[in-house]
């Protein structure tokens, strides 16, 4: 197969965050969470139909949120690429195999992502026959999964979450071996800058803590979160106080590079 044809179109990290924010919005009011704790969406199933950039964003968002994710795409190579990138956990050829994996993790309320190489419409029918009902559906081919929608699955719509998008990555990309510890320190500053009185702070902190695990090699080199103006200002002030850390990263605030 021509590598140019098979290469996946990957989402920007901001698109993944926005998909995550949309998913959390759908879950609002449906999960019982202690005021000081975000338990995530463990026990939920997110079904993604087609692994284009938006579908990949939904897959990663679901895993970060704590859901089990079943991604259906007719091109097996797409799932295999995501497996190589560290973005999905399993690639399977039939729904029975997917069900064996998903059933255990949904029961344990643990995140897992399974890419199924199959036709979207046929898979949706088979899911109904097997009693596999997702809480949320996403992806370009989601309209082929009408029976699942009729049975109560919500549709994850593409959109832009409120707030300024703040991104950061290593300044010296050649030193990728150092990216993890450096970016993790910036992640902590970002989490600390989030307002304690802001409703979405708990799940944004979950994002900052867990997204690196599920972004894989292709997406994990850049981090992001959406912030209110005062939060972004606090984060920049914290970076200014740590000159050694600031010198190692490039930070972009709402599309504009920040001088650190």
Tell what function each PLM region has.
Residues 1-42, 143-144, 154-186, 195, ...:
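Glycine/serine-rich phosphate-binding loop and adjoining beta1-alpha1 elements at the start
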Residues 36-60, 73:
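Glycine-rich adenosine-cofactor-binding loop
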Residues 50-55, 76, 120, 143:
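Gly/Ser/Thr-rich loops at beta-strand to alpha-helix junctions
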Residues 56-104:
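Catalytic or ion-translocation cores adjacent to nucleophile or general acid/base/metal-coordination motifs
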Residues 93-194:
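Phosphate/diphosphate-binding loops
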